[in-house]
Regions:
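Charge-rich, solvent-exposed alpha-helical interaction surfaces
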Residues: 6, 10, 37, 54, ...
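Negatively charged, low-complexity tracts enriched in Asp/Glu with abundant Ser/Thr
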Residues: 97-135
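Intrinsically disordered, low-complexity regulatory segments enriched in Ser/Thr/Pro
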Residues: 148-178
Length: 178
């Protein structure tokens, strides 16, 4: 997955969950995640400043005509600040994921079986396969699709005192954690 796709997907997720606000948005990424997104090998000995410049240059090129981003780095994470113009561009010109919309609706039911049914039926509808992995503890059940064309993320859904909660991971990050 590319960094710009993850950024846009995250902003669209926020728009669906809390609504669009014409303001700057800050996204935080661990340094290792940024390296993965940009295919920077550990053997490449980039200083923090060089990596920060590389991210800034990469995103400036990818976001031409949409708005600006500013990249900073502190300790082991990067802050990517999306300008209100880019946020507005994403809100007006990029459609939200159909699956994510359906997922959030299923999640609001508070019923894990409705979420499970969504993943299974969506996979079947798109001629794909649903993957379901139960985890002990706070990860709950991890749902994903074998085919990334359907949706490239892993959704860890957990039943708690206040209903269903979830965390969405890029598959490579999920594999590192579990």
């Amino acid at each position: 997955m590319k960094l710009e796709k993850h950024m846009i997907d995250t902003v669209k997720e926020w728009h669906l969950k809390i609504g669009y606000q014409k303001e700057n948005i800050r996204l935080y990424y661990p340094t290792e995640s940024v390296k993965d997104f940009l295919d920077v090998k550990n053997s490449e000995k980039l200083s923090t400043e060089e990596l920060c410049d590389k991210v800034q240059s990469y995103l400036s090129e990818k976001m031409i005509g949409m708005g600006t981003v500013n990249v900073s780095q502190e300790e082991n994470r990067f802050c990517i600040e999306i300008s209100k113009e880019l946020n507005e561009y994403i809100a007006k010109h990029i459609e939200p994921s159909e699956f994510l919309q359906e997922f959030l609706k299923a999640l609001s039911s508070g019923n894990i079986e409705i979420v499970r049914h969504l993943f299974r039926s969506y996979a079947q509808q798109k001629q794909g396969h649903c993957i379901e992995e139960p985890h002990e503890g706070e990860a709950g059940i991890a749902f994903s699709f074998q085919e990334e064309r359907i949706d490239p993320y892993v959704y860890c859904v957990e039943q708690g005192d206040f209903g269903l909660t979830y965390h969405r991971f890029v598959k490579t990050e999920y594999e590192k954690l579990f």
